[in-house]
Amino acid sequence: MVMMLKKTVKKGLIGGMSFAKDAGKINWFPGHMAAATRAIRNRLKLSDLVIEVRDARIPLSSANEDLQSQMSAKRRIIALNKKDLANPNVLNKWTRHFESSKQDCIAINAHSRSSVMKLLDLVELKLKEVIAREPTLLVMVVGVPNVGKSALINSIHQIAAARFPVQERLKRATVGPLPGVTQDIAGFKIAHRPSIYVLDSPGVLVPSIPDIETGLKLALSGSVKDSVVGEERIAQYFLAILNIRGTPLHWKYLVEGINEGPHADCIDKPSYNLKDLRHQRTKQPDSSALHYVGDMISEVQRSLYITLSEFDGDTEDENDLECLIEQQFEVLQKALKIPHKASEARLMVSKKFLTLFRTGRLGPFILDDVPETETDHPNSKRVVVL
């Protein structure tokens, strides 16, 4: 399955993506990131501990490889954020994988106070040996764009505010749905005796992403702006993943009318209307909106199940897979209630479909496979990114 997907991506079959030399180079690396990377490197030299925030759905792909050598020389905790959107069984395998490599790792939800408190307890434990001899300690939070650094900083800030109600504190970090919101390095105190400061940093990518699939995973999870790759391409890539993995076949219960299944909670109890799914944790919609979105999500999953179950081709055949994806775009347009003759209908389908994935409405996913072979082991050349 993995080799098939890599082959499909490399040949440019996902959304007609052409990465040939004459096709033009995708610019993953906005200009401000170069200066930000230099600033981060300078702060890392002074930091006593690094919290590297990664997206739990892409534990390996969301690592900034350019900073790994510098971070590996520091006390470091890998925080796999957005655990509520990740498959819990696979996530447990990932945390065990990192721990087996003697790398501290914890899965968190940056919006959960109890989850962040567990992370801070681990930070305190890691700093225990230097707390007695250092009057001031620096903890730096780093990560690629849109992995939830600012949300984590805000939660830490709230905890610090409760500890020190009269201290002078910086404003909370800005949280937005687009990558690259935080563009400056700022910090605030979270403890006395010794003084412990937490430094936030802007999200930065590597200047060049040589692995196309890694780039697509970053785009799918929202770490690369949709406009860089194109929503249609990203949606087609996600459909390829679903089909090759056979995920829609697990949604059979929707066709049979059974109110049970691996993602039943995600379908029967949606929390937001589709328009507001990009802005989670907003006010609750009324019951009619809940039913509308619930029906729409069910119809999306039901449609994908039917198209894949009735598909008589081979998902490992590039042409067959491409035909299946085209068919699924047609049924998704109907399921998402997009007018048949609407201009830019495919773009509208792509945007709504991606929103459902990114907000967990289609169920929990992890896109990266846990390394199993010796060549994928963290001590090998590849795992410089741990």
Swiss-Prot record:
Q: In which tissues is it expressed?
A: Expressed in seedlings, roots, leaves, stems, inflorescences and siliques.
Effect of knocking it out?
A: No visible phenotype when heterozygous, but completely female sterile when homozygous.
- Motif DARXP motif, chain ranges: 55-59
Where is the segment annotated G5? 109-111
> Entry's PROSITE patterns?
G_CP
Where is the protein found, in the record's own terms? Answer: Mitochondrion
Q: Does the keyword Glycoprotein apply?
A: no
Region spans: G2 = 180-184
A Gene Ontology biological process annotation? cytokinesis by cell plate formation
UniProt-listed InterPro entries? G_CP_dom, GTP-bd, GTP-bd_ortho_bundle_sf, P-loop_NTPase
The record's region (G1) falls at: 143-150
GO molecular function terms listed in the Swiss-Prot or TrEMBL record:
GTP binding; hydrolase activity
Q: Which UniProt keywords apply?
A: GTP-binding, Hydrolase, Mitochondrion, Nucleotide-binding, Transit peptide
Q: Where is this region: G3?
A: 200-203
Query: Domain named CP-type G: which ranges?
Result: 37-207
Protein's name according to its UniProt entry:
Short integuments 2, mitochondrial
Organism for this UniProt entry: Arabidopsis thaliana (Mouse-ear cress)
Gene of this entry? SIN2
